[in-house]
């Protein structure tokens, strides 16, 4: 039978163990919700946008990046279906410093433009974070890349024999991420994602989750699409989904279809505490994010309003925030009349309801400038909003005559960004939601917050 002194010692030990267990649980919970720092960004987008600074110039000046089809692609077109030969295109998609990355000329020629551009942007993003790329070799750095539209070799009638060993890997979605990991010697997870138009935001969500679970210490994330053929235009034209003038008119009464485009965008992510300790730039932080699926909705490719509401609420819960803590949403907003109306209703129900009309949710879409960049869309939207935070301005969206009458705007305090709106710093952090939805049914929503002031 223990004496009184032994019992007291046992109780002290039990109390200490309980305190340590509670502390470990608190630390684990905090780690799973730690803000993720955006430490650098890189992009190639329509309108000669070759950097995040170029993207800000594009949206701040209200410039439209839609052009005719590039002459250097030598595209041919069937007579049917007819559609406008207009879209958003990156400059010089074939440009690639193969020797710099140790890629031989035959392998370079057999490698699709998306792999080439993503590899160059990965290097650029690391350098923009003031990190020497060679210092990441053999580190648990992750790569999460949304990759869609692998049409580079689809029109080949025959393949030169010297290219055959490289063509499979050069047009493989899996190697979009794998090639980055190989070239930089990275040993964290390398994952390619294809959920169609939500791919890059899904990849960013997966990278945030991996960082919070300590599966990697730093992560490159984003995605892209580069069209080697006009097949995507043909497909959407058959669906009657393309705008006659090639332009997205998000949430507008005049919306008449999607403007198709291409692009590539990456961000470099790190746990906020690690970024501060390493002295890396902190451009903004990701407070929370979520994914879900449309499931058995109205059709395989049809948007699902309740699912969109669900992913928004899940992202807010992951961030530990309420809807009125968010100032603006960078929407999916492709300019399809029904799709935009469904998205508007979801935003009105989640962000707009019970919100003061004096402080509405501001709504915009970079697709009005660039067109729908497909696999890059979510990452491009994120970069736009990071730049908006840094420039204290919400830029206007283009091609909006008036709000679509297919949405019931009186159900909530949501307003379209038909003009630029000042976004000044204040006592509480400024925040924005970023959405990406897809014909695959996979939805993503992310909560972005301005960078906190440096600690003591």
Language model region names:
Residues 3-456:
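Condensing-enzyme catalytic core of the thiolase-fold
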